[in-house]
């Protein structure tokens, strides 16, 4: 489930939530056992979308692991896109009042931009990897609740924003 909250929400989500918040509530296994799910879709322009998920709940332990692969040739030459993604979340309930969890999300994609039909671009490619990890300790009592959370975001972007046809990329543009 995705919640979009417009306007300042710094009281609930921290001082950087001045313009709004996108809160992604991940699915978790409610009943005991293991649940697997796989989705595959194929369409025009050699477009492929895949996702696999595994959810586990055993006693106080829970986990979610997902992986995805998406690609397309695009509707024009030199407009390819390819994406790999992975997500893992582990949780443990110490009691009915206290739980701890941690997760990691990593996505890598390769994309090509051919420019406009009137002004084509050559070798305008991007290779981007983004990641996020978090850890939380939560408590929920009848009249009070609280969470101590830590977040870390990171990324590596390699973007070739254009150079002359047949020339090598300029080092300071490709980092």
Please describe what each predicted stretch is:
Residues 1-4, 12, 16-39, 50-53:
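N-terminal periplasmic accessory domains that precede
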Residues 2, 22, 36-40, 65-67, ...:
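Membrane-embedded beta-strand positions of outer-membrane beta-barrel proteins
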Residues 5, 25, 53-57, 66, ...:
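Transmembrane beta-barrel domains of outer membrane proteins
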Residues 7, 25, 39-45, 68-70, ...:
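Outer-membrane beta-barrel pore domains and translocons
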Residues 20, 34-38, 48-52, 84-88, ...:
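Hydrophobic, lipid-facing positions within transmembrane beta-strands of outer-membrane proteins
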Residues 31-33, 47, 58-61, 95-97, ...:
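Strand-connecting loop/turn motifs
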Residues 40-50, 75-81:
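Solvent-exposed loop/turn segments connecting transmembrane beta-strands
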Residues 72-79, 83, 93, 97-146, ...:
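Flexible loop and strand-edge segments within Gram-negative outer membrane beta-barrel domains
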